[in-house]
């Protein structure tokens, strides 16, 4: 079952989307069915240029193979990319793969971290 969403997080997403040089990509552990329902419920998901869905790939985070699918599919250079996730192990795997990372705790904390990086 899908719940609500944090409007401040959506505002951050919209702000990043408006920045010309930022390509937003997603990596989710949703099932295929949940993702398709979410796409209908949450129009802000259209701000992502692409999303890798674990249900489609039959692999879940924190399996590094799922991250590699994201990297390969979208030609990501991890050292020039920021990975944001609310689960610590997922952030640690991304760090191991060379990503800059932010462990999401709250919308305010995320905004502060992005400001420190000069992204907001």
Task: Label each PLM-derived region with a short phrase.
Residues 30-33, 57-58, 88-89:
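Short, solvent-exposed loop/turn segments at secondary-structure junctions
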Residues 50-58:
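His/Asp/Glu-enriched short active-site or ligand-binding loop at hydrolase and phosphoryl-transfer sites
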């Amino acid at each position: 079952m899908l719940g609500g969403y944090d409007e401040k997080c959506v505002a951050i997403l919209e702000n990043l989307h408006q920045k010309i040089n930022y390509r937003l990509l997603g990596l989710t552990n949703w099932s295929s069915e949940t993702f398709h329902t979410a796409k209908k419920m949450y129009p802000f998901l259209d701000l992502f240029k692409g999303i890798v869905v674990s249900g489609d790939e039959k692999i879940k985070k924190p399996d590094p193979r799922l991250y590699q699918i994201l990297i390969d599919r979208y030609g990501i250079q991890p050292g020039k990319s920021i990975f944001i996730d609310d689960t610590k192990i997922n952030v640690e795997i991304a760090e191991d793969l060379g990503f800059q990372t932010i462990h999401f705790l709250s919308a305010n904390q995320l905004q502060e971290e992005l400001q420190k990086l000069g992204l907001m």
